[in-house]
Amino acid sequence: MLLLVAPEQEPVQSTAPLFTERCPAGFPSPAADYTEEELDLNAYCIRRPAATFFVRAIGDSMKEMGLHSGDLMVVDKAEKPMQGDIVIAETDGEFTVKRLQLKPRIALLPINPAYPTLYPEELQIFGVVTAFIHKTRSTD
């Protein structure tokens, strides 16, 4: 089952502070006490609200690139699919999220080596995945 969620036509602006200091993934340093600007996640993730929808990922064929089952994908159906893009596609009546290969032959590539490459005879691309949203803590 594929769950599609369309954003509001005019996203409500909701900002949070964006700190100028980068946060190292190693040993922490004291954080600065100031912000560079306000960050609106709608503006950051959604370039074209009327052409954007959200899809929840299911499965683990793309986990090596950080897309896990249950993650939310931001998909822009107005983006022109290009070599190497992550796309939402339909092939053989099934929806899938895969990396698009255009040359030398059209293929849908899983990132997880446990899954086969798909060489569809017919392919419809519904949009280009422009962002993943991954929660690190359950909200239950």
UniProtKB/Swiss-Prot annotation:
User: What residues correspond to the site Cleavage?
Assistant: 25-26
Which GO annotations describe the biological process of this protein?
A: DNA repair; negative regulation of DNA-templated transcription; proteolysis; SOS response
UniProt lineage: Bacteria, Pseudomonadati, Pseudomonadota, Gammaproteobacteria, Enterobacterales
What does this protein do, in the record's words?
A: Involved in UV protection and mutation.
Q: Provide the family line.
A: Belongs to the peptidase S24 family.
Q: Which UniProt keywords apply?
A: Autocatalytic cleavage, DNA damage, DNA repair, Hydrolase, Plasmid, Protease, Serine protease, SOS mutagenesis, SOS response
Q: Which Gene Ontology cellular component annotation is one that this UniProt entry carries?
A: protein-DNA complex
Question: Which residues does the entry assign to the active site, renumbered to this chain?
Answer: 61, 98
Per its UniProt record, what CDD domains does this chain match?
Answer: S24_LexA-like
Q: Does the keyword DNA damage apply?
A: yes
The protein's Enzyme Commission number = 3.4.21.-
Leading EC class: hydrolase
Tell me the protein's name: Protein SamA
Question: One matching Pfam family, short form?
Answer: Peptidase_S24
Give the molecular function GO annotations. Answer: DNA-binding transcription repressor activity; sequence-specific DNA binding; serine-type peptidase activity
* SUPFAM superfamilies (alphabetical): LexA/Signal peptidase
InterPro entries referenced in this protein's UniProt entry, alphabetically = LexA-like, LexA/Signal_pep-like_sf, LexA_repressor, Peptidase_S24_LexA, Peptidase_S24_S26A/B/C
